[in-house]
UniProtKB/Swiss-Prot annotation:
<dbReference type="InterPro" id="IPR016208">
    <property type="entry name" value="Ald_Oxase/xanthine_DH-like"/>
</dbReference>
<comment type="similarity">
    <text>Belongs to the xanthine dehydrogenase family.</text>
</comment>
<dbReference type="InterPro" id="IPR008274">
    <property type="entry name" value="AldOxase/xan_DH_MoCoBD1"/>
</dbReference>
<dbReference type="InterPro" id="IPR037165">
    <property type="entry name" value="AldOxase/xan_DH_Mopterin-bd_sf"/>
</dbReference>
<dbReference type="GO" id="GO:1901848">
    <property type="term" value="P:nicotinate catabolic process"/>
</dbReference>
<dbReference type="InterPro" id="IPR000674">
    <property type="entry name" value="Ald_Oxase/Xan_DH_a/b"/>
</dbReference>
<keyword id="KW-0479">Metal-binding</keyword>
<dbReference type="GO" id="GO:0050138">
    <property type="term" value="F:nicotinate dehydrogenase activity"/>
</dbReference>
<protein>
    <recommendedName>
        <fullName>Nicotinate dehydrogenase large molybdopterin subunit</fullName>
        <ecNumber>1.17.1.5</ecNumber>
    </recommendedName>
</protein>
<keyword id="KW-0521">NADP</keyword>
<feature type="binding site">
    <location>
        <begin position="238"/>
        <end position="240"/>
    </location>
    <ligand>
        <name>Se-Mo-molybdopterin cytosine dinucleotide</name>
    </ligand>
</feature>
<dbReference type="Pfam" id="PF01315">
    <property type="entry name" value="Ald_Xan_dh_C"/>
</dbReference>
<feature type="binding site">
    <location>
        <position position="208"/>
    </location>
    <ligand>
        <name>Se-Mo-molybdopterin cytosine dinucleotide</name>
    </ligand>
</feature>
<keyword id="KW-0500">Molybdenum</keyword>
<dbReference type="Pfam" id="PF02738">
    <property type="entry name" value="MoCoBD_1"/>
</dbReference>
<keyword id="KW-0711">Selenium</keyword>
<comment type="pathway">
    <text>Cofactor degradation; nicotinate degradation; 6-hydroxynicotinate from nicotinate: step 1/1.</text>
</comment>
Length: 425
């Protein structure tokens, strides 16, 4: 392979670096238009409940409030989702998490928006909240969607796992748990919607997914995609957290009814509450090896909390399942993964899509094996590392190297040099 790279080793200037340094980059909240309205969302204050009554009349009567809308105002589809359409734009039957959107308000000033939100009254029939994966899986657990809380199931098997464990010289077994994480992007969710000079409903928004956004906004408003335009503003961080919808549909719905530009900027608290999170997972892993440290079998039982809505759950469970073995040759593999709905915050896309959680599991097991066998943790990794030509449990044959062995060896050399690795391990 030649060394005349176009990117590696070259200084590449980001296209928006100058604007950010000069302070001229326009983020979504920086956009304003004449006669623009401000918007806010009335959200659920309970995690699981049926709506008995919703009174918007007092909010609508406030002078300067131009729209107070619930799901009845949606002309098209009231369900969205990148893979499974299970999240309402505005709740129509029951709330499934704290912070579900129930109504939207547009008014002439931000203070009037808050006054209108405070004037809305609601009565709930509260339901049992499901906050653990264990409770979600119990037979008498109330279903959050449909008739079951099981969201996704994946199974991966390769070789003869049971027979392989019987031949192992050593077996280590443990349970690993990872917690829910929020992206904490610097810029909270924000957007502005308006009709352009040609009658195109346009949304300028902080997003990572403009083409998906357009389809969802168009579907909600029963418009063809050609009548909706999404403009991705300079985006102040996302890390996967802005792949889901945020303000797009709410702004667009208010502009659709008022025919005026509408701006919505979430507070830090609101953005953190309702944006997606990294999936919490629990993984029970059993790993077998020969006395010289060569892996023979891996068995994993994995559970994940996808929260109230699917978001990217189907993609996350798939990637977590196929990465349970890590970058190691394992001739016998069995993985059973199950993701469940709960009334917790929605889990979605977060850098790594389930692979970081799986890494906690397989790297913990490699450390446990090394300790039990009295081996150097780096040696056992090098011994089992994938090389070109290796066949994975998924059937994939590796045609190229990512330099794992070389990287481990270089890392150890540096560790010996700067911290006396041989003395501290």
């Amino acid at each position: 392979m030649g060394k005349d790279y176009q990117v590696l080793g070259k200084n590449k200037v980001k296209v928006d670096s100058l604007e950010k340094v000069m302070g001229t980059a326009k983020f979504a909240a920086d956009y304003s238009f004449p006669d623009m309205l401000y918007a806010g969302v009335f959200r659920s204050t309970v995690p699981h409940a049926r709506i008995v009554s919703l009174d918007l009349s007092k909010a609508r009567a406030i002078d300067g409030v131009e729209a107070v809308l619930d799901y009845h105002a949606i002309p098209g589809k009231n369900r969205f989702g990148i893979i499974i359409k299970d999240e309402p734009c505005l709740v129509d039957d029951k709330v499934r998490r704290y912070g579900d959107a129930i109504a939207v308000v547009a008014a002439q000033t931000p203070d009037l928006v808050q006054e209108a939100l405070d004037a809305i009254t609601i009565e709930y029939e509260e339901l049992e909240g499901i906050f653990t994966m264990e409770r979600a899986l119990e037979e008498d657990s109330p279903a959050i969607h449909g008739d079951t809380n099981i969201h996704q199931v994946k199974h991966l098997e390769y070789g003869d796992v049971d027979a392989a464990f019987k031949q192992c010289d050593i077996v280590v077994e443990d349970t690993y748990s990872t917690h829910r994480l929020t992206h904490m992007f610097i810029e909270p969710d924000a957007g502005v919607s308006y009709y352009d000079n040609e009658g195109m409903l346009t949304v300028v928004v902080s997003t990572q997914n403009p083409h998906y956004d357009r389809g969802e906004v168009a579907g909600m408003l029963a418009l063809p995609n050609s009548k909706v335009r999404i403009i991705q503003a300079t985006t102040g961080g996302g890390f996967g957290g802005k792949l889901d919808l945020s303000v797009q549909c709410h702004c667009a719905l208010l502009t659709y009814h008022t025919k005026k530009p509408v701006k919505m900027v979430r507070s830090r608290e609101e953005s953190t509450t309702v944006s997606s999170k990294r999936h919490p997972m629990t993984m029970h892993c059993k790993t077998g090896a020969t006395k010289d440290g060569r892996l023979q079998a891996v068995q994993v039982e994995m559970f994940g909390d996808t929260g109230a809505y699917a978001s990217y759950g189907p993609a996350v469970i798939t990637r977590a399942t196929v990465h349970c073995m890590g970058p190691y040759v394992v001739p016998n593999v069995r993985v059973d993964a199950k993701f469940v709905y709960t009334n917790n915050p929605m889990s979605g896309a977060f850098r790594g899509f389930g692979v970081p959680q799986a890494s906690v599991c397989h790297e913990g097991q490699m450390n446990a094996l090394a300790k039990a066998l009295g081996m150097d943790p780096i040696d056992i990794r090098i011994l089992n590392a994938h090389q070109v030509g290796a066949k994975l449990a998924t059937g994939q044959v590796l045609e190229n190297s990512v330099g794992l062995i070389e990287t481990l060896e270089k890392a150890r050399e540096k560790a010996v040099e700067v911290m006396g690795y041989e003395k501290t391990r």
